[in-house]
Amino acid sequence: MKKISRKEYVSMYGPTTGDKVRLGDTDLIAEVEHDYTIYGEELKFGGGKTLREGMSQSNNPSKEELDLIITNALIVDYTGIYKADIGIKDGKIAGIGKGGNKDMQDGVKNNLSVGPATEALAGEGLIVTAGGIDTHIHFISPQQIPTAFASGVTTMIGGGTGPADGTNATTITPGRRNLKWMLRAAEEYSMNLGFLAKGNASNDASLADQIEAGAIGFKIHEDWGTTPSAINHALDVADKYDVQVAIHTDTLNEAGCVEDTMAAIAGRTMHTFHTEGAGGGHAPDIIKVAGEHNILPASTNPTIPFTVNTEAEHMDMLMVCHHLDKSIKEDVQFADSRIRPQTIAAEDTLHDMGIFSITSSDSQAMGRVGEVITRTWQTADKNKKEFGRLKEEKGDNDNFRIKRYLSKYTINPAIAHGISEYVGSVEVGKVADLVLWSPAFFGVKPNMIIKGGFIALSQMGDANASIPTPQPVYYREMFAHHGKAKYDANITFVSQAAYDKGIKEELGLERQVLPVKNCRNITKKDMQFNDTTAHIEVNPETYHVFVDGKEVTSKPANKVSLAQLFSIF
């Protein structure tokens, strides 16, 4: 067999085992752990290449042959960082490994058979990740959805009804009628969607009715009154219907302090939003719940990474989002109590320790919907620059840290909200919601987004040009966005109760409708690469944060990666 240099090999087939790839302009280095494509048997599409009839493409149609194969992709996932062909069939990932013609090539799996019905997408030199999942969405404007999608987010969970004051402040779609409208509106979009109902009620019947109307869980928010009674009732109903409860706790400590909230939760699983507290929650010590075994703690992206500008920008955001008035002294004091540089500084470190498990946006309500992925990687890079390599790393790479941070916006929010059977990772059997990145633009600008196995968004040149690449090149909607294809390519998530009662038929929905599962039988230990529990305390006078007796903090960055270099205009 003829041998070629590693440099030639990488230029032709992409990086292989032992090769290293820098993510964007960060200091994060991914090393290829394994290559499943088999040297000498690689797939390559194009003139004079191997992916042709009678060679890597079988002549014989079969029930196994793929709809699409992504060749020689570098997969970055919580399951590993490795190179493989990815086979897609019927909108799902059918196989990962060595694809091709099993009659002519060694090592080809039955579920990776290339035939006359197979389309090819060249993954050489590209990184493939699962689509991101943002679990903290205020559905204030529908324009958020394409903005998030272009960033690599393919699933949005939250609540709202548009720019009503309740939605500006809280991620809640309250009541059967509002849920009906939002479930119907979801039909329009290239995005998996799920809606949270109002959990602020000490009445089980009103709570249950919303779940049966299609909500996938509850949001309890202080602006509607996060009382111990509301917490208890929402969790009781959630346990009955197997749905998640998300909470924004009581900043003013009117109905109780953090200890009272934890007593009301009583060891049951709960997803805590913006657990640091600048986005809301018991002042000054809501952050201490992040160390508990039954809490799935999340950040929203305004506070990560911690920079020299973080504190200053929060006051105006808070005033607008929570309908406050700068001329009212008490409103200003309320805002001041939430913006604490000390706890914000600790948040970055808690992410690096795997104590915080999830990142999200808080879209248009103290959060930027298109920056979940970017800010997650900025935080990872900031922490590496400040604290060095993690002790868990093996070899001269950052693979463990990469898996830790990737999990925060992919598999962990999927597990938290009962959708990990469908999305959240690059695994066989899951929906083919995949994001393709050039390594140089990783975390900032995807090359292409595949939705339900079909190309939905891509960087594309002038439509009147003779080839696809001439300027201006920018994101353009592809065919999965249009006609009835969008119904097959996207999912509306509902509760099992609503699914069993035929919510799809009742509301005349054409999209895929799937039920959430296993929301209650999970704990912090189910959070991949982010399952650390600890005893956290906050000094009530200085706001300094201590983990197992040791102070944790970080410095505000005056420069971050993945920033203006990638956004000239």
Curated annotation (Swiss-Prot):
Residues 131-569 form the Urease domain. Ni(2+) 1 binds at residues 136, 138, 219, 362. GO terms for cellular component: cytoplasm. PROSITE patterns: UREASE_1, UREASE_2, UREASE_3. The keyword Protein biosynthesis does not apply. Carboxylation allows a single lysine to coordinate two nickel ions. It catalyses: urea + 2 H2O + H(+) = hydrogencarbonate + 2 NH4(+). Binds 2 nickel ions per subunit. It holds the Pfam family Amidohydro_1. InterPro entries: Amidohydro-rel, Metal-dep_hydrolase_composite, Metal_Hydrolase, Urease_alpha_N_dom, Urease_alpha_subunit, Urease_AS, Urease_asu, Urease_asu_c. Ni(2+) 2 binds at residues 219, 248, 274. Optimum pH is 8.0. Active from pH 4.0 to 10.0. In unbuffered solutions, the dodecameric complex is active at pH3.0. Substrate binds at residue 221. It is found in: Cytoplasm. Induction: By nickel ions. Belongs to the metallo-dependent hydrolases superfamily. Urease alpha subunit family. The novel dodecameric structure of the enzyme may allow it to remain active at the cell surface at acidic gastric pH. Within this dodecameric structure the 12 active sites are clustered within the interior of the proteinaceous shell. This may allow a high local concentration of ammonia within the enzyme which may protect the nickel-chelating groups from protonation. Heterohexamer of 3 UreA (alpha) and 3 UreB (beta) subunits. Four heterohexamers assemble to form a 16 nm dodecameric complex. This is Urease subunit beta. It comes from Helicobacter pylori (strain ATCC 700392 / 26695).
